[in-house]
Every structure is written in C-alpha cells, then in structure tokens.
Amino acid sequence: MLSKSITRSLKQQVTKKSLSKAIAPSIARSLATSTPPSPSDGLKPSHVYTKLSHTDDPARSRFFQYSWGSWLKDDALKKKQRETIFSIEGLTAYLNSVDSLRVPETAKLLQPKEEQGTFVLQNNLTFDVLGAKSDVLLIKSISSIHEGKHHRIYKLTLSTGKDLVLRIPYKLESDTAIASKIKSEVATSDFLKLKLGLDVPKIIAYGPDRNNAIRSPFILQEFIEGELLMKKWNPLEPDSDKTDEDLKSVIAPIAEFQDKILEPVFTKFGSLYFYNDVTTELQQNGEPYEGENDEKLLKRWRVGPSVEKAFTKGKNKLSQDVIDQYNGPWDASNPEQVMTSVAEIEIENARNKLAIVDADAGDVTSKDLLQHQITTFEHLKQITPKLLNSKSPSIKNVEELFKPRLYVPDLDPLNVIQSTEGKNYFIDFEGSTIKPFILSSYPKFVEYQGAKIYDLKVDIPGFDEMDPVEKQQYEFMYYKTRNERLWEVELNKHRHDLIAVASPHIKVLKSPYLQALDLKHSKDYLYVEGAIVQLQSMWEAYVANELVKQDKDDKEFPIKYDEKYLDQYQLDLSDHQMETVSSPFSATGGWIPQDMFRTLKEQGILVEVGEGNYEIKTDKILENPPSETGEEPKA
C-alpha cells in the first residue's frame, strides 16, 4: 500500500501547479539542486554469497549492480554507468602483496610506491589499519555498504580482524577525469593528515585507472567504525533551545574543520597532487605553500590542474587537450582567471556539442538550447573580470579573501563519521580545489540562495491566516535562512578576517560564477543569466563603491540587454521553474529511492513506457488521496 506521506507529496505536486509568485523564484533553484536523500536502512541490497574461487558465479553480477534507486528516464543506461565491476580474485592477491610492503612505523616518510599499476602509501600500512603482520593476509568477506552519487563503497573484512574500505568510482566521466580526481583526492587527504594533523582515514593505496590487478580505478583506505553526523541533523525543526543546540552540534565541528583547512596559503590556484603525479614542469614550480621547514614534507605535494567539477562534469565530449587549456593551475596574482576559465570551458563545451548536432552525429540536444547556452556563457566571460575588485577598499580584508586557500566542496554531515572513540573523522575530498575564499560557496547542507526570511510573522504579513501548504513553503524558507545564519555565526567566530563573504553584496556579485559551477540540468544556464541580470540594477552603486573592477567614471553595465531578450529570458526561466516545482522527482534528477519506486509501480502510479523510461500516472494519484483523518488510503 502506498504510504500517506508519499501519496500526499505526489498529489500536492500534481494538483498545485504553481507556487505563489513570492515563493517560486526563490525556492525553485533550491529544489532543483537539492541532494537526493540517502536510502533508508530498508533499502540495503540483499546479500550475495559467492566463493572467491568461483569466478563464473552468475550471482556475482548482482554484487556490482546499482540497486539503491531508479530513474524515470534512461534507467538502464544510468544503472549501467554505476556498475562497479572489479576482480575479487585480483583484489585478494593485490592486498596480500601490499601487506608485504610494510615498513617500520619509525621509517622515514616515503613517496607513494608504484606497485602493479597502483600506488601504495607504505607509511600507512600500520597495525591499527591492517592488524598484525602474518604470512598471508586474507579477505574473509566483502560487503557493499553504500551506493552514493559518485562512488560505491565496499567493506573488506580481513583475516586479522581489521576492516578496510574499497571505494570504486562510477563511470560518469572520462577515464582521465576519474584518474585526476583520484590522484588529487588522495594527495589532499594526505596533506590534511600530515601537514594539518586532521582526523581523516588513512589511505593505503590507490589506482587511478583500471590497469591493475583489481581492474578498476579505486581508493583503498582505513575503515572508521561509528555513526554519521548526519543522524543528528534536523534542518527543518521548529525553533527551540534544544533545536538551536542540536543544529550547532552539527555545524560547529564542520566549521572548525574548515577553519583548519583555511590556515595554509598556497602559491597557486589549482588542486593538490603528489609530487610524482604532476608533470616535470609543474614539479619545478616549487612548494605548494611557503615556509615549510619540515624536511620530510618537502617535494611531497605540488599544485596541478584543478579538478573542480566545472572541468570534469559533463565534459566527456571534449578532448583532454582542450580541457587542459582551461583547468590551470593559475598564478596567485591572477584570481580572475579562476572565474574566467569556468566561462571559457562552458563556451567550448556548448560549441563542441553544437558542432556535433550540425554534423548530425547522433546528439539529440536542441540546437537552439545550445545557442542560448553559448550566449549566456559569453555574457559570463564578458562580466567575470569585473565581478569582484581584488583591490577594493570597500571589502574588509580583501587581500586575505583573494589568497589561494583550500576549498573542500563536500563538507557535509554525511561525510563526517563520529567514531566510537569520540573523534569526528572527515571523508570524501573529491573535487577539492585551491581558490580564493571569496569565490567559495557555503557547504550545501546550510547554503541557501533564495529570498531570506528572518521572522515569519514580521516578514510575511498574514502568515497566521495562510493554509498549511502555503505556511510550509514559507517555513522552509525561514529554516533555510536560519541554518545559513548559524553557519555564518560560526565562520565569524573562527575567521572574523574572512567574514566579508557573508555580505549580501558579495553573494550577489559572485552568484553568476557559483551558478555556473552548479549546473545540473541543460536549462540551468538560465540561473547563470538570471544572476547576471540581477546585477544590472545595482551596478552603478557597485562601481561607485569600487566593489567591482570597473573605472569609476564608467557606470555602464558590461552586458547590453534589449527588452526582447529579457522578455524571452523571463519566459524561459518561468517555464523552467514551473517544470521544476510541478514535476515529481525533478529535484532529484528523476531519481527515486528503490523501495518507493517499487511501491509506485505496484500501485500503477509508475508505468514503464519503454527503453528504460517511466512516467507518472497522475490520475492514479488523484484516485487514491491520503485520508485527512490520518488513515492510510484504501486500496
């Protein structure tokens, strides 16, 4: 039977075809970019039993298949991209060879050792990670413990009683992009542990590609026993002293971690790599930060090309040679190039797709849509060099805000494990980059780009008389505002010198760049254009106060819009927002948790229409509305 909450949620999306004009623009983007919920405990895959020696066991394929959700469109293709096939036999033999590379814990710090197409961090092959040294290290069991957005996580139980984590990336990007992200993430984690002394799991080995015994790119690391900090995060709880305390108990440790990673100032913009994972030219650029006096850390890391998602996500049709023209690294004296490069690679990507369409090479993307994308990203490229004045006298501590600092995009309670020892271990540093702090965004779990509501009864006239659905919409906006404000309080507490990023004007000025980093849908370029258009009314004031990099005598807005263009833009944006807020599961990209997917199919609400595509039968939802008395609907 379809649960009341699922039915009501779908029914509201079907019957309430529009939100009030005051709300729709502010929450549509938030809905469109929200993170799909983690599957509940009841969604864990069923057990698959197989012997390590039974290589032809047909049951094994289920062990590698994605099972925590389904998609409304291209379901088969998207699941195929998320298959994580690897050699169980190869892993067993490889792990035993890695165990033979242990060095005394008193040994000097070594560079990652190349081993069978992989790299081993020998200093992390310790008793607390692998257990006691034995003649043969065996894998007793392998279990799948998480299927995330970008990786699948397996838990390996060893004959020594210790556990390891094997992380296999999905095939969502090019092989080169996956390799670069793995190399950079491992180096970043190594830097956080060795240089900053932060609590992160020890990584013992990594393979940037599938040319190894495991036959897959991977990261092999220490298993941390504990609970996710996310279990304590209740962002939509009504105000109370307890709510305030609970929210701060989650925000505070993440803010403290950010404070520590902001300490080092780097010599270039880009991403971190091990010394031997960058070109000879980049090796010769010198240390990634100044003032290193610890000899064992010299020549351990270097700044290389950025692995920020703008340079990897959705760029499969671009050659790596083209991507390398835009992904850095960049000199510390040129922070504007960090922004401009994002606009340039999006222009190149759209033009390349347009050329494929013109050549009739099978790409079905709308030609008009691609031309609109190109126009918008050309606008972004045109305005980017002027967006923020790195010498502005009106921005407090402006020089500090533009210095190269480490940015971790996935600071989130989902990526914090509270260990049984009481420590907060941080995981998942994929896509970390070195950029000006002023160009970073808040962590997604607290970030809110919509209209701010600080007091429901003061800011929203007639709130008490509204119907429950309308109240919920405004309450959502209020809670998002509250949570972001709590984050800013913590930021100010730790880094008062960087608090200027909380200025509404700074947020508005960098919004076009941040929107370009957060493209999830082919029409999300409209949010980039909207962020640029929004600047027009305040531009003259920004020029006068030297917030933007434009001569004070030149008050003209850099982009020349005509009325026809703006009218069409507003129409397109409204259509896109309406599609977002009125289409079931649009906020998750059409992804549905597997238990809900199964239930909807059984109820006849979800119907397969061929080629791995499904559609929602809205009439079925309306036939079986939830009871207002709190009872389950009748079958």
Swiss-Prot record:
Residues 1-71 form a transit peptide. InterPro entries: Kinase-like_dom_sf (IPR011009), Mito_inheritance_9 (IPR051035). It is found in: Mitochondrion. One of its GO terms (cellular component) is mitochondrion. Residues 1-49 are annotated as: Disordered. Residues 1-17 have a biased composition (Polar residues). PANTHER family: ALTERED INHERITANCE OF MITOCHONDRIA PROTEIN 9, MITOCHONDRIAL. Keywords: Mitochondrion, Transit peptide. Disulfide bonds: none annotated. This is Altered inheritance of mitochondria protein 9, mitochondrial. The gene is AIM9. Gene3D superfamilies: Phosphorylase Kinase, domain 1.
